[in-house]
Amino acid sequence: MNTEEIRNLLDELYQQKKNPDQVLREISRSTFEDLGFARVDHNRKQRKGFYEVIFCPGKTADQIYRIAAEMMDKKSDVLATRISEEKAAYVLEQIPQAHHNPAARTLSILSRKRTKKGRITIISAGTSDIPVAEEARETCDIMGNRTETIYDAGIAG
């Protein structure tokens, strides 16, 4: 919750448009949203520097979609990792603007365009490391960094 949103809530309380319990509920909701199967941490970016990441193994396609939709509702960037092709297809049907990288096993949604900063080089030793390197690249990209990749840089015995 940003300063303007807090100020608006206080104004509504002062003008008696909302009672103290309603204001407390909204403040509480701004921090975590309980979806029944997951608690979405909306203030993680303020505490840790980046939004919550959806780790997909063990979640259904609908659960991944519902978490992503909740995050989008709060104008958060969305990064889902280790997502299967089937689950990604389901989420893409619901959220066509999502970006899926099958090699990285990621699905991402940017809340807004941003200017990229810095440069991070991701180097993998062998071709079997490419999925992990691609996941790192997608993570760096959504965090607003320019990336460069060098694959299969290792030297086999």
Feature-to-residue mapping (PLM):
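Short coil/turn connectors at secondary-structure junctions
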Residues: 48-51, 74-76, 95-96, 103-105, ...
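Short secondary-structure capping/turn micro-motifs that flank functional sites
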Residues: 87-88, 107, 156-157
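Glycine-rich phosphate/diphosphate-binding loop of Rossmann-like nucleotide-binding domains
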Residues: 117-157
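General beta-strand structural signal in soluble alpha/beta enzymes
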Residues: 79-82, 99-105, 109, 149-151
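Long amphipathic alpha-helical segments
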Residues: 1-84, 89, 94, 98
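Residues in well-ordered beta-strands of folded domains
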Residues: 54-55, 81, 108-110, 123
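Long, charged amphipathic helices and adjacent flexible linkers at domain junctions
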Residues: 35-41, 103-111
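A broadly conserved detector of short glycine/acidic/proline-rich loop/turn motifs that flank catalytic sites
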Residues: 59, 113, 126
